[in-house]
Curated annotation (Swiss-Prot):
The keyword DNA damage does not apply. It comes from Salmonella typhi. It is found in: Cytoplasm; Cell inner membrane. Gene3D superfamilies: HflD-like. This is High frequency lysogenization protein HflD homolog. Keywords: Cell inner membrane, Cell membrane, Coiled coil, Cytoplasm, Membrane. It holds the Pfam family DUF489. It is a peripheral membrane protein. Residues 79-122 form a coiled coil. It comes from the Bacteria. NCBIfam families: PRK00218.1-1, PRK00218.1-2, PRK00218.1-4, PRK00218.1-5. Belongs to the HflD family. PANTHER family: HIGH FREQUENCY LYSOGENIZATION PROTEIN HFLD. GO terms for cellular component: cytoplasm; plasma membrane. The gene is hflD.
Amino acid sequence: MAKNYYDITLALSGICQSARLVQQLAHQGHCDADALHVSLNSVIDMNPSSTLGVFGGSEANLRLGLETLLGVLNASSRQGLNAELTRYTLSLMVLERKLSSAKGALNTLGDRINGLQRQLDHFDLQSDTLMSAMAGIYVDVISPLGPRIQVTGSPAVLQSPQVQAKVRASLLAGIRAAVLWHQVGGGRLQLMFSRHRLTTQAKQILAYLTPEL
């Protein structure tokens, strides 16, 4: 059966978008707020109509992720910011595979996400309350699966509890995207053997987006 590289590329961009948000937060203490909203919302939407629906139904919502994906796919250097992004992306994929084989963790994750949906009736998605709740899910359910993702950045920035919560919430969104990636036929071998196909697809999607003014 032929793989749907459009859906695979969208889901992979979702992972990369989370990786980029983590990097922005760790180095600067802030990140692209619109992209963060899209990624966080993807965790809570349990019944999307399509792969694109997970990310709000618009390709533009994944602009940051698509651009990051191209950087990861075409990274010639194993050092610097692209190396960080590649490490975060691959680490999220590894953790997702561990999650998928841990039945108890999957059940707990589902229950905790249902709890988030109830909290959304009272708090904004990017409120400290929701951010802390998402971070708590990552710490309690995902981190114990190991290996832990080592986030690098500014030590002063990373000491902030608010930044720590946003980083962990972004990593949780990355796990969500990695689950989706496998559901639509994604696999790590594609990063080696289908690099050109993924690059072409990502460029095509970006080309259709309205240029930012």
